[in-house]
């Protein structure tokens, strides 16, 4: 007779199989900092559903490897030491805030070019450390992964997938100038009403703004092709042993998970293999730590203002910090400021400094009146989720783009970090808190965000699992990938039709001339005969 323990073990095994449904292996090519915080949410959900998730890790300080996360981390054996992602991001933040505003256009372009060349060198080291390490590649190949989830900020994830012959899924906010989405993913980007990233334009553009939008697009395309993709075209061809391009490899992505949604974006065309999953990391607020809750409650009817420039900018110049502190001291609200620098001399009694704050929980607190933010996508979506109006202090990357969108939708005001005065910042903070329209618009966006048939996180996980179940999603890939640029724009058809029109016009003209000539000759002959008779 079978023992009770054996029966229990049998049923437990059945439950495990039933709970998993199908358990697959996921390889992850991540990016660090705020990108990782977003991607981690997807990976934790995949792990919770029984999938085996392996993250390829290079030197970083943000990627959390604690045991509570159901992920496996595989360290990349680097050929030589590279700068950490945090240091690189702090460097570009310093350039954007403190250096570039004081340079001429030419000097700024040269400074940025030098910086990005250093970053490209770091990325090349990561790529070679993986792709040219046969033992490491064999280890990945033997693991038989079902999909690669890639953040394309760091190149070569798609190259690893190509070498291993594994389908891959992208997760990104955008590429510079939408270059990858447009040229590699074939996503239509009509410049007449789709503002290019970092142009700070809306979908309602004047003629001058459309010219600016076009110039931004051309500038990004020239910059990327000349100083970035040309290098990677050569590297990808060298690695694969055949002529190819970076864009051609990127274009093989099965699904593009875009970290935005129509609450932030303006309406524009998209393709069936592009899925908008903005705000997937957002969640209901949890109770605050006791000391922080007491400080928030002490604000009374005035409420609190949350101030954070994100994980990238921990310190400001002393002058800028004193300016901000003096402004915050003039408002009746209590202020929770995430700041790691020297305590400003002008700091008011209503302001408290923190090395870290539970941002989502604070934004979800009923006493929060406004959010002063750098405009990162994660923070923007947490504010939208909880319906909190914003004062944007953008610096780089997607931040100016995000704040421009929020300002156009009436949920935020923008001030410039490099040129703002105390009057500018104070006016913006007071307006966002005291004018009802900002709160109303923030709540409207919040209702739009919450009113979705399927939650963003569930959509993201569904499409990754879809790719694993079907070994790809090539049926969603448009035929534009197989067309040349002149075929895509139907220039050959237009040329053929123009040739037909010209040919037909030529034939008709010749025929008319021939008829006219015959009639003229006939009339001339009649006139000649009449003259002879006379």
Swiss-Prot record:
<keyword id="KW-0472">Membrane</keyword>
<feature type="transmembrane region" description="Helical">
    <location>
        <begin position="494"/>
        <end position="514"/>
    </location>
</feature>
<keyword id="KW-0732">Signal</keyword>
<feature type="topological domain" description="Extracellular">
    <location>
        <begin position="19"/>
        <end position="493"/>
    </location>
</feature>
<keyword id="KW-0808">Transferase</keyword>
<feature type="glycosylation site" description="N-linked (GlcNAc...) asparagine">
    <location>
        <position position="204"/>
    </location>
</feature>
<dbReference type="InterPro" id="IPR035595">
    <property type="entry name" value="UDP_glycos_trans_CS"/>
</dbReference>
<feature type="signal peptide">
    <location>
        <begin position="1"/>
        <end position="18"/>
    </location>
</feature>
<dbReference type="GO" id="GO:0016020">
    <property type="term" value="C:membrane"/>
</dbReference>
<dbReference type="InterPro" id="IPR002213">
    <property type="entry name" value="UDP_glucos_trans"/>
</dbReference>
<keyword id="KW-0328">Glycosyltransferase</keyword>
<keyword id="KW-0325">Glycoprotein</keyword>
<keyword id="KW-0812">Transmembrane</keyword>
<dbReference type="Pfam" id="PF00201">
    <property type="entry name" value="UDPGT"/>
</dbReference>
<dbReference type="GO" id="GO:0015020">
    <property type="term" value="F:glucuronosyltransferase activity"/>
</dbReference>
<dbReference type="InterPro" id="IPR050271">
    <property type="entry name" value="UDP-glycosyltransferase"/>
</dbReference>
<comment type="function">
    <text>UDP-glucuronosyltransferases catalyze phase II biotransformation reactions in which lipophilic substrates are conjugated with glucuronic acid to increase water solubility and enhance excretion. They are of major importance in the conjugation and subsequent elimination of potentially toxic xenobiotics and endogenous compounds.</text>
</comment>
<feature type="modified residue" description="N6-succinyllysine">
    <location>
        <position position="135"/>
    </location>
</feature>
<keyword id="KW-1133">Transmembrane helix</keyword>
<feature type="glycosylation site" description="N-linked (GlcNAc...) asparagine">
    <location>
        <position position="102"/>
    </location>
</feature>
<feature type="topological domain" description="Cytoplasmic">
    <location>
        <begin position="515"/>
        <end position="534"/>
    </location>
</feature>
<protein>
    <recommendedName>
        <fullName>UDP-glucuronosyltransferase 2A3</fullName>
        <ecNumber>2.4.1.17</ecNumber>
    </recommendedName>
</protein>
<comment type="similarity">
    <text>Belongs to the UDP-glycosyltransferase family.</text>
</comment>
